[in-house]
Swiss-Prot record:
<comment type="pathway">
    <text>Purine metabolism; IMP biosynthesis via de novo pathway; 5-amino-1-(5-phospho-D-ribosyl)imidazole-4-carboxamide from 5-amino-1-(5-phospho-D-ribosyl)imidazole-4-carboxylate: step 1/2.</text>
</comment>
<dbReference type="InterPro" id="IPR018236">
    <property type="entry name" value="SAICAR_synthetase_CS"/>
</dbReference>
<dbReference type="Pfam" id="PF01259">
    <property type="entry name" value="SAICAR_synt"/>
</dbReference>
<dbReference type="GO" id="GO:0006189">
    <property type="term" value="P:'de novo' IMP biosynthetic process"/>
</dbReference>
<dbReference type="GO" id="GO:0004639">
    <property type="term" value="F:phosphoribosylaminoimidazolesuccinocarboxamide synthase activity"/>
</dbReference>
<keyword id="KW-0658">Purine biosynthesis</keyword>
<comment type="similarity">
    <text>Belongs to the SAICAR synthetase family.</text>
</comment>
<dbReference type="GO" id="GO:0009236">
    <property type="term" value="P:cobalamin biosynthetic process"/>
</dbReference>
<dbReference type="InterPro" id="IPR001636">
    <property type="entry name" value="SAICAR_synth"/>
</dbReference>
<dbReference type="GO" id="GO:0005524">
    <property type="term" value="F:ATP binding"/>
</dbReference>
<dbReference type="GO" id="GO:0005829">
    <property type="term" value="C:cytosol"/>
</dbReference>
<keyword id="KW-0067">ATP-binding</keyword>
<keyword id="KW-0436">Ligase</keyword>
<dbReference type="InterPro" id="IPR033934">
    <property type="entry name" value="SAICAR_synt_PurC"/>
</dbReference>
<dbReference type="InterPro" id="IPR028923">
    <property type="entry name" value="SAICAR_synt/ADE2_N"/>
</dbReference>
<protein>
    <recommendedName>
        <fullName>Phosphoribosylaminoimidazole-succinocarboxamide synthase</fullName>
        <ecNumber>6.3.2.6</ecNumber>
    </recommendedName>
</protein>
<dbReference type="InterPro" id="IPR050089">
    <property type="entry name" value="SAICAR_synthetase"/>
</dbReference>
Length: 237
């Protein structure tokens, strides 16, 4: 597979065209950002850790019947992925209260949420990813009603799979975001990534934060903690 021109450069990943029009290369960089890019640092090995972690999780989801974009690891920091027409919203599920939910609603951090809360956010850094709902998505043509329903169903399916996976490894899946796209056949497919950059994970016993909040809050040992998460899941890095 031949890497060609850069298609898109995000805060922590770069996407490249390939010589196959249906395939892209997803490159995980060491860049680490928070607060819509206001805080940025380079963390050694982070690109490698996130690339391999993402491949591990996406493989678990494929085994559970969730179609994903990831095809193969092709280097320590790169994966071959299917080309998708990405839907410009994030699907967020919250199992415990944390982050922006606590700030918005004034609730206590760590409150169990039953049922889990589902939220949509528009992917727009300039607007700080505002919350939107089904009506916004339909009115602005970002997705159809059928696609909205499919994204919700898949997001909750992912929740069932990954809550159990992390629970068995002594961790709580507090919340996470997913992004979906449409493949060449019109199917909704899970894209982007699932890494500790895009979810919150706490140790079940101590409530130690094991995700990008370590970077946001200056807790240190970011990559070391990501590696600990991976190793608890049985992924040797």
């Amino acid at each position: 597979m031949e890497k060609r021109d850069e298609l898109y450069r995000g805060k922590a990943k770069t996407v490249y065209y390939t010589d196959d029009s249906d395939k892209l290369i997803l490159h995980f960089r060491n860049d680490t950002s928070a607060f819509d890019g206001e805080k940025i640092e380079q963390l050694d090995r982070k690109g490698e850790v996130n690339n391999k972690f993402n491949h591990f999780i996406m493989t678990k989801l494929e085994e559970a019947g969730v179609a994903t974009q990831v095809e193969a690891l092709i280097s320590d920091t790169e994966s071959l992925v299917k080309k998708l027409d990405m839907i410009p919203v994030e699907c967020v599920v919250r199992n415990l209260s944390a982050g922006s939910l606590v700030r918005r609603l004034g609730v206590e951090e760590g409150q169990a949420l039953n049922p889990p809360i589902f939220e949509f956010f528009l992917k727009n850094d300039a607007l700080h990813d505002p919350m939107v709902n089904d009506y916004h998505i339909l009115s602005f043509g970002w997705a159809t009603q059928e696609q909205i329903a499919e994204m919700k169903a898949l997001t909750f399916k992912v929740n069932n799979v990954l809550k159990a996976l992390f629970d068995d490894a002594g961790m709580l899946l507090v919340d996470y975001k997913l992004e979906f796209g449409v493949d060449k056949d019109g199917n909704i497919v899970l894209g982007d990534e699932f890494t500790p950059d895009g979810c919150r994970l706490w140790d079940k016993e101590t409530r130690k934060k094991m995700d990008k909040d370590r970077f946001r809050q200056g807790l240190g040992s970011v990559v070391e903690t990501y590696i600990e998460v991976a190793e608890r899941l049985g992924l040797s890095l």
